[in-house]
Amino acid sequence: MKILAIHGAWSSSISFNYLKFKTKSKIWTCVDYDHRVDDWHNILNKSVGIIREPYIAIGHSLGGMVALHMSQDANCKGIVTIASPLTGLDLNLLQLYLSRSTLISAIAKNSKHIDEIHNLSYSHLPVLHLVANKGYNPFIYEANDGVLPFKVQTGWSCGEIYEIAANHYEILQSDATVTAINQFLKKRF
């Protein structure tokens, strides 16, 4: 099964190198975007139709939210989100103002994009949410993975939730992540 991989904000497709090497699927297509220029719609447009045969969409962080949108593509046969802000980011006005990024506001709690994702149907395909449950950020006063609060990754779901003992970035180099993805692929494809 082919993989469509969408990286997180302020990252690149290089972040998937370990998973590409270790997972059973060796046919990966990565969507690259530039967070300084591309907005939510540009990233979606770069992702839609890039693979014209059956594939699994895998996204890390913001990329996981884009992967969920791919459920509307007839060729998308499954989705794996990795450390993604499934409920949307819980931001105050100061954080929104200081972020200087349209990507942050696009995935803020109650944004139109998060509402769209929550209102899509996922009953026609399997979804796996891999949640990073280790990490520390002194500015987040609750359990977090170093970037996202735990509750943001688990407060909404449209599939199975599986916790990985890693922080927000280590989860992409975790053997537990490789195992979970391989089991997801083996069980369903």
Regions found by a protein language model. Give the residues of each.
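Short, Lys/Arg-enriched, disordered terminal segments
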Residues: 1-2, 49-50, 185-189
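Serine-dependent carboxylesterase/thioesterase catalytic core
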Residues: 3-7, 14-17, 23, 28-31, ...
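C-terminal catalytic-base region of ester-bond hydrolases, centering on the histidine
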Residues: 11, 122-189
